[in-house]
């Protein structure tokens, strides 16, 4: 199956499908005429006498140097080779596929001036599985993601490396094995390919999709913890949240009510419970998780716009002029990444406090210490809670805003940068930490509920526990725990826990 993209209006759901399923994509042929028109205009400018940045001049601080018409192709090739300065581990295939799809969307708007054969090559590489090797580090998020996108483009011209059928090869060999030929870049094409925010945006989108799934699952594990601790569902009453008015809070409260509906555990202590109020990590879940949901939704709107944007320079305007601007500056992406980081950090922080509550017999309302069936002989989930604290602390350190840490580059021509790529890339580690924290809460919450037997939890949460127990058996005695934590985290990552509950309960990214 190949997804057909309409540049300028590709929805978030399609972008998530590209990220998660790795489907090949192509541009709607209706946009080809606009692409060819802009390419023809670039060819006219290149043949003329007027200097235009990036077409017949040098780049960055070297923009004042005029390039002879006979050197234009060499200029583009040199640009790509000189900018391949990435370091670190290769980005994963699903991230690179998303980067390439975003580049197609941008080029397909018909304002960049590349020839149709450039777009076709990217489409064919995605279809046949030639995936450029892009190192993870090297971009400051302005002027675009130059180094990582140069590595992408290098593969297109037969330079650098690419992955093909799981093998890392010289790009020329990978293209040959796939039956493809490298492209010879014409005027401006190299610049159009590397001068954009697609790497930062792809990483931020990946962070967003991972964070949203974790946020949904955290509502489930939070409900489990509430029932395990014999907490009250009264703070989730609809009117409390409508009186405040925040959409995320309202949606989170609604989800928690639905998840806990029908719990016999809850019914057992509706009367005679001497506890007046639960701790904040139980009582304030709608307020905290809802606020996180709100900023994830705000980031989603920003990133959907950016994914459909034209972010190279110069641009071919509707009147045919080539005009220099600054759409390559990824400040919106940097801000969105920082917002996502805050949400990821806070979801993990409140989840960790619920884990700590459940393993503490002074707070858990009758549960054994560390949820061990034979405390003392067994340590139960003692160190699982410690691990969750370690991961929470690491995320707090990583949540520092990246966007405020600009530094001048390129001989002060590029004197303010966004740091969007770094800000977005750290989301991969932060969400991995969060998935592990939520997985640990799933283990503690489910075990806590099981220790309340013969009282039973709600039908929705019972389905979640059944999915969990299909991969992680209940803890009777101490055992090697690392596999349990790994398997529980995988149930968060692959959406199995979120998918266990009835459709419509968990809030989407739609505001």
From Swiss-Prot:
PROSITE patterns: PAL_HISTIDASE. The keyword Cytoplasm applies. Pathway: Amino-acid degradation; L-histidine degradation into L-glutamate; N-formimidoyl-L-glutamate from L-histidine: step 1/3. GO terms for biological process: L-histidine catabolic process to glutamate and formamide; L-histidine catabolic process to glutamate and formate. Contains an active site 4-methylidene-imidazol-5-one (MIO), which is formed autocatalytically by cyclization and dehydration of residues Ala-Ser-Gly. Its EC number is 4.3.1.3. One of its GO terms (molecular function) is histidine ammonia-lyase activity. The keyword Cytoplasm applies. Belongs to the PAL/histidase family. This is Histidine ammonia-lyase. It comes from Brucella anthropi (strain ATCC 49188 / DSM 6882 / CCUG 24695 / JCM 21032 / LMG 3331 / NBRC 15819 / NCTC 12168 / Alc 37).
